[in-house]
């Protein structure tokens, strides 16, 4: 029933795109806008094909429902790395011909130009993004502002409500890092009953003060409305609010969890060949730089990071220091393990939901 409802919603919501040559599904908000400005519009202009962007809270869910129902209306989807691996294993996605991806602008072969892990059997990275936390600078004196992952969980030192994404992924890892587990040891720790108990025990320390969010747009809105003192968020959402809208928000990079976002093609996409062409265009050196000019997610190609990228919103902000991949932002960071979440997503989310209900 759940899959049927998801599919029905998807078909109703996205039916208006039926006449488009390529339909791209993404996450909406600042991220969807960045992909629209950096990829969808330029590709359409360059090729003469029609293209449209549609939104979903998590594109992996509706595209899986569409494929299983045999009624696919989306050609390209933007999904999290673990979902790209899982859906590929389940036969939901078309394979990607990695050899067909264009060389970098400097002539470097794609296989050598992409960062390790950025190209998988069924997906190509469009950016590297991060789960971070942020606070409103007007709420804290400079000498009392939160600075570490541990501060997020320290209600005595930094009082106030906390915003957290409602799910196990990125929350359990963040809790362990805040509790002193080194990034290199997080997944080994989380793979043990004792480590899992430790993560939930850390979450227990702030549970009564948490405001849960699900859609990415909710996190910066919680800050703007004063509902929380600080919140976890997608770094691009905070950048868009702070730099694009002038909100007094500050990111704390300590304890960030970063990962690749992937473009994939659902099995049975109505315009498969055009979808593949779109992905080649979007993940070229120029395509990746074009997206990064609109949102603070790092390009996953070496050639796309050679020259400074300037924020299109104001024509002056240099994006480098605002990216998850900036060296100064990666001091205490963790690359999200897709293998871990492919293997443990269901069981850990079941326990997470049970914990929420307690």
Residue positions per predicted region:
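A ligand-binding cleft/hinge motif common to bilobed small-molecule-binding domains
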Residues: 84-86, 230-248
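Early extracytoplasmic/lumenal segment of secretory-pathway proteins
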Residues: 21-86
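Conserved C-terminal helix/tail region of periplasmic/extracytoplasmic solute-binding proteins
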Residues: 327-358
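Gram-negative bacterial Sec-dependent N-terminal signal peptides
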Residues: 1-19
């Amino acid at each position: 029933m759940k899959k049927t409802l998801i599919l029905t919603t998807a078909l109703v919501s996205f039916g208006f795109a039926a006449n488009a040559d390529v339909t791209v599904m993404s996450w909406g908000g600042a991220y969807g806008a960045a992909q629209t400005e950096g990829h969808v519009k330029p590709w359409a202009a360059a090729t003469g094909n029609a293209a449209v962007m549609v939104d979903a809270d998590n594109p992996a869910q509706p595209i899986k429902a569409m494929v299983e129902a045999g009624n696919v209306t989306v050609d390209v989807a933007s999904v999290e790395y673990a979902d790209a691996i899982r859906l590929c294993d389940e036969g939901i996605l078309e394979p990607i011909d990695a050899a067909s991806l264009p060389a970098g602008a400097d002539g470097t072969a794609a296989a050598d130009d992409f960062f390790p892990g950025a190209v998988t059997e069924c997906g190509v990275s469009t950016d590297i993004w991060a789960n971070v936390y942020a606070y409103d600078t007007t709420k804290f004196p400079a000498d009392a502002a939160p600075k570490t992952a541990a501060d997020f969980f320290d209600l005595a030192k930094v009082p106030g409500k906390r915003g957290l994404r409602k799910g196990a992924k990125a929350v359990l890892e963040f809790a362990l890092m805040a509790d002193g587990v080194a990034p290199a040891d997080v997944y080994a720790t989380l793979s043990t009953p004792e480590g899992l108990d430790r993560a939930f025990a850390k979450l227990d320390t702030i549970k009564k003060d948490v405001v849960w969010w699900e859609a990415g747009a909710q996190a910066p809105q919680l800050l703007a409305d004063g509902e929380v003192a600080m919140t976890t968020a997608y770094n691009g959402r905070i950048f868009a609010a702070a730099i694009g809208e002038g909100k007094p928000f500050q990111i704390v990079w300590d304890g960030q969890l970063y990962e690749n976002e992937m473009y994939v093609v659902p099995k049975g996409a109505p315009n498969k060949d055009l979808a593949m062409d779109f992905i080649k265009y979007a993940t070229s050196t120029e395509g990746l730089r074009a997206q990064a000019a609109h949102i603070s997610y790092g390009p996953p190609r070496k050639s796309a990071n050679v020259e400074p990228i300037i924020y299109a919103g104001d024509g002056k902000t240099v994006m480098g220091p605002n990216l998850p991949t900036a060296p100064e932002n990666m001091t205490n960071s963790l690359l999200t393990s897709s293998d871990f979440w492919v293997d443990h997503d269901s069981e850990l989310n079941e326990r997470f939901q049970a914990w929420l209900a307690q």
